[in-house]
Swiss-Prot record:
Family per similarity comment: Belongs to the glycosyltransferase 1 family. Bacterial/plant glycogen synthase subfamily.
InterPro entries membership: Glyco_trans_1, GS/SS, Starch_synth_cat_dom
Function: Synthesizes alpha-1,4-glucan chains using ADP-glucose.
Full protein name: Glycogen synthase
């Protein structure tokens, strides 16, 4: 019997449905917490992909009207996860991206879609499902943010509440006139509640009303308390600083294991790095790059957005050509960046290759085949790509922000002398500083003994969920003890 029961509320979860790192965290953390005596059940919307994969499902909350049509709650399992599923076809039975119309705009009913998720989470928190009464409700990102409000304003004795910020840039702000329609009482629309500059703030509600706030790296926890990175919420976060903690993410080291990865060409580990070049050759072929084992091959797996700094990399294409460096990019996002990237690939055949979209298998192949992974983010709450790069023997080249600063040891002179470097950092995140760091990478590439030492250091780094899970478990235990 587990000592603490947690209900996680998420809008996506790997391997059922994924648009970003939130899904990876939601999918991997429950198993890691089980080893700490924490039992996690996860509430997720009944998207088509979820409904197709859930097994042994039984109805635990009967159908009732919810924003225009009946909805019910199922409990079942998929991929080893204990799941509650909000089965509401009128809200979730839509193809493609779970948040966006095909033209990239938000679904206009998103406030109701995710309020429904939060109201269901609140009901489960109060024991609406037979045999399940969680000690803690753990809400992830803005889509789950109103759960704290529904629990707070209900008036009954409630479970503890924890809000996790995966990216403060996405806040879920909606018109104030929706307050009643969303089932919130008038008193909720206050500075201490859901009100946020005249709107209803889903994430703001979570940050104001939750017992604890976590975010996904210590550096990001400090950054978001500043006007530069606080996205308008820095004042609130400063007032709640004693309730805020940064806990680094891990990765699922069974899914991300180069020694047994079925998605890559040639499995390898730190003892068999001589096998790794076969993956590089396959990657060059996949992206239409020249079959040159001696060329430094940079990989990118990213959203194509201003935040991720892909424009900084595109500004250095002439430099990469002078250095004889190749580039393979997997990503999707802002149309202008997509256009520039495709133009670069067309103008530089054999040197630049691009696949637009997201493909899990190609992401694994880039990690296994690229010599280095470039992550030039202007801000980065944690980042998982650099953790995968460490595990797969690709040198992370990262901006010194957020979780990138916390997880990569820059190979400066002191680190090289001490034998502890694991990658390259640059600051500030500008095109010129990235260019200088790419030149530094090219110089290190020309010294195979040093390069190999950095790669081996990275592969020996523990990037699993073991330590983060222990920190979450302590947070949950402390909260239960205080209540």
């Amino acid at each position: 019997m587990s000592e603490i029961s947690v209900l996680a509320i998420v809008s996506e979860i790997f391997p059922l449905i994924k648009t970003g790192g939130l899904a990876d965290v939601a999918g991997a953390l429950p198993a890691a917490l089980a080893g700490e005596g924490i039992e996690v059940a996860t509430l997720v919307p009944g998207y088509p992909a979820v409904m197709a994969q859930i097994e042994y499902a039984e109805t635990v909350i009967d159908a009732r009207p919810l924003y225009g049509a009946p909805a019910r709650v199922l409990r079942g399992s998929a991929a080893g996860l204990d799941l509650f599923v909000l089965d509401a076809p009128h809200l979730y039975d839509r193809p493609g991206n779970p948040y966006l119309l095909p033209d990239g705009r938000d679904f206009p009913d998103n406030p109701f879609r995710f309020a429904a998720l939060c109201q269901t989470g609140s009901a489960l928190g109060f024991g609406a499902a037979p045999g399940f009464l969680p000690d803690i409700v753990h809400a992830h990102d803005w889509q789950a943010g109103l759960a704290a409000a529904y629990l707070h304003y209900d008036g009954r004795e409630r479970p503890g509440t924890v809000a996790t910020i995966h990216n403060l840039a996405f806040q879920g702000k909606y018109p104030a006139e929706l307050l009643g329609a969303l089932g919130l009482p008038p008193q909720a629309f206050s500075l201490e509640g859901v009100e946020y500059y005249g709107t209803i703030g889903f994430l703001k509600a979570a940050l104001a009303l939750s017992d604890r706030i976590t975010t996904v790296s210590p550096t990001y926890a400090a950054e978001i308390r500043t006007p530069e990175h606080g996205m308008g919420l820095d004042g609130l976060l400063r007032t709640r600083a004693e309730r805020l903690i940064g806990i680094l993410n891990g990765i699922d080291d069974e899914v991300w294991d180069p020694s047994s990865d079925p998605l890559i060409t040639e499995p390898f580990d730190v003892e068999t790095l001589a096998r790794r070049p076969a993956n590089k050759a396959a990657l060059q072929d996949k992206f239409g790059l020249d079959p040159d084992p001696g060329a430094l091959l940079l990989g990118v797996v990213s959203r194509l957005s201003w935040q991720k700094g892909l424009d900084l990399l595109l500004a250095n294409l002439d430099l990469l050509e002078r250095l004889g460096v190749q580039l393979a990019v997997l990503g999707s996002g802002e149309p202008e960046l997509v256009r520039q990237l495709l133009e670069a690939a067309e103008a530089r055949p054999g040197r630049v290759g691009a696949v637009i979209g997201y493909d899990e298998a190609i992401a694994h192949r880039i990690q296994a085949g690229a010599d280095a992974i470039v992550i030039p983010s202007r801000f980065e709450p944690c980042g998982l790509t650099q953790l995968c790069a460490l595990r797969y023997g690709a040198l992370p080249i990262v901006a010194r922000v957020g979780g990138l600063a916390d997880t990569i040891i820059d190979a400066n002179e002191m680190a090289l002398a001490s034998g502890i470097g694991t990658g390259l950092q640059f600051s500030p995140p500008t095109a010129d500083m990235l260019g200088a760091t790419l030149e530094r990478a090219a110089r290190l590439w020309a010294e195979p003994e040093i390069w190999d030492e950095l790669i081996e250091n990275g592969m020996l780094t523990d990037v699993s969920w073991r330590r983060p899970a222990a920190l979450y478990a302590k947070l949950f235990r402390d909260l239960v003890r205080e209540r």
